[in-house]
């Protein structure tokens, strides 16, 4: 998902602890897709309660949010609104990929394959129920969230220009939307299996500073947007044969994306609209506040309604209580 400009991005390995005492907006759908793909049973099926409701997202949001709070990182979750019409092609392609994955899963089951994880992990849907349950859990935990009018990553990036320190997301598109700082791999760090390969790699959290990316490549924000569009974004197909490094070289030589397209004899549909969307996306001003967690409601919701282990939940609820007391003074200092 998003644009792949990783080859020209300056990143720094970091840790949760090193990012403490800061507030970050979170591209929630981006995180939910990661959780639905990675938090699964041994056979690849998503975690479910006794009623057949998917709970992978609740498991991930609960434990990862507490982990952030324990490291004095204050999260503000941002939910997607109505997608831009520019994204229709991407949405259709993703739906086709899921349908293909479902067909491959059925074939694998018929063949009697035992390891179905690679198939299940490619079939993820963020349903209204998943969104509602996530918001309900965040409400009980006292964690604020913002409903974006359109793209969540655009709203989360906009918030970095106001009073949050950065955005937590895997997508480099946040840089095109002007996010001052991005934290990546904060939901999937550690030893991870490479998709569709029987090998593992260690993934470390990292941060990216927009100004460093621009300075290191000697470009401006408009040129960075042009590079992303040449490579391809959720709103357009990239130009075949052009990766981030080649796009950078072309942009620096020709000056801007329109000059590049004229030089190579190519066209990108809706170019002006795409550029404008990255520069002026639909966003809202917001007011958020961290509240005291309702630990009884959390326990009832997770344990009584969704079959979570009461013993495990209570251990983490105690951590949540302690964290709330420890962070109250800092929150007052930060947001008054």
UniProtKB/Swiss-Prot annotation:
PROSITE patterns: XPG_1 (PS00841). Keywords: DNA damage, DNA repair, DNA replication, Endonuclease, Exonuclease, Hydrolase, Magnesium, Metal-binding, Nuclease. Its cofactor is Mg(2+). Mg(2+) 1 binds at residues 27, 80, 151, 153. Residues 115-255 are annotated as: I-domain. Its EC number is 3.1.-.-. InterPro entries: 5-3_exonuclease_C_sf, Flap_endonuc, Flap_endonuc_arc, HhH2, PIN-like_dom_sf, XPG-I_dom, XPG/Rad2, XPG_CS. One of its GO terms (molecular function) is DNA binding. It comes from the Archaea. GO terms for biological process: DNA repair; DNA replication, removal of RNA primer. Mg(2+) 2 binds at residues 171, 173, 234. Binds 2 magnesium ions per subunit. They probably participate in the reaction catalyzed by the enzyme. May bind an additional third magnesium ion after substrate binding. Residues 1-98 are annotated as: N-domain. Interacts with PCNA. PCNA stimulates the nuclease activity without altering cleavage specificity. Structure-specific nuclease with 5'-flap endonuclease and 5'-3' exonuclease activities involved in DNA replication and repair. During DNA replication, cleaves the 5'-overhanging flap structure that is generated by displacement synthesis when DNA polymerase encounters the 5'-end of a downstream Okazaki fragment. Binds the unpaired 3'-DNA end and kinks the DNA to facilitate 5' cleavage specificity. Cleaves one nucleotide into the double-stranded DNA from the junction in flap DNA, leaving a nick for ligation. Also involved in the base excision repair (BER) pathway. Belongs to the XPG/RAD2 endonuclease family. FEN1 subfamily. This is Flap endonuclease 1. The gene is fen.
């Amino acid at each position: 998902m998003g644009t792949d400009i990783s080859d020209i991005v300056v990143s720094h390995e970091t840790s949760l602890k090193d990012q403490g005492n800061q507030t970050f907006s979170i591209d929630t759908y981006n995180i939910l897709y990661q959780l639905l793909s990675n938090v699964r049973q041994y056979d690849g099926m998503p975690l479910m309660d006794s009623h057949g409701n998917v709970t992978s997202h609740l498991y991930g949001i609960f434990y990862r949010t507490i982990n952030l709070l324990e490291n004095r990182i204050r999260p503000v979750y941002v939910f997607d609104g109505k997608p831009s019409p520019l994204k229709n092609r991407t949405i259709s392609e993703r739906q086709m990929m899921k349908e293909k994955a479902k067909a491959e899963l059925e074939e694998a089951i018929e063949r009697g394959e035992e390891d179905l994880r690679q198939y299940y992990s490619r079939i993820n849907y963020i349903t209204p129920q998943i969104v509602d349950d996530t918001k309900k859990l965040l409400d009980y935990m006292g964690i604020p969230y913002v409903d974006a009018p359109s793209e969540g990553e655009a709203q989360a990036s906009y918030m970095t220009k106001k009073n949050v320190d950065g955005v937590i997301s895997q997508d480099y598109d946040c840089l095109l939307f002007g996010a001052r700082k991005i934290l990546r791999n904060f939901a999937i760090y550690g030893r991870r299996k490479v998709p569709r390969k029987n090998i593992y790699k260690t993934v470390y959290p990292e941060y990216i500073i927009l100004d460093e990316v621009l300075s290191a490549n000697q470009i401006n924000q408009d040129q960075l947007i042009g590079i992303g569009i040449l490579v391809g974004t959720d709103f357009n197909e990239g130009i075949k044969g052009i990766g981030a490094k080649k796009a950078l070289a072309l942009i620096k030589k020709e000056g801007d994306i329109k000059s590049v397209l004229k030089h190579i004899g190519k066209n990108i549909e809706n170019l002006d609209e795409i550029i404008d969307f990255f520069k002026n996306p639909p966003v809202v001003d917001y007011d958020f506040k961290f509240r005291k967690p309702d630990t009884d409601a959390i326990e009832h919701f997770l344990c009584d309604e969704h079959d979570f282990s009461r013993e495990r939940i209570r251990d983490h609820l105690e951590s949540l209580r302690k964290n709330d007391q420890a962070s109250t003074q800092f929150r007052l200092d930060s947001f008054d």
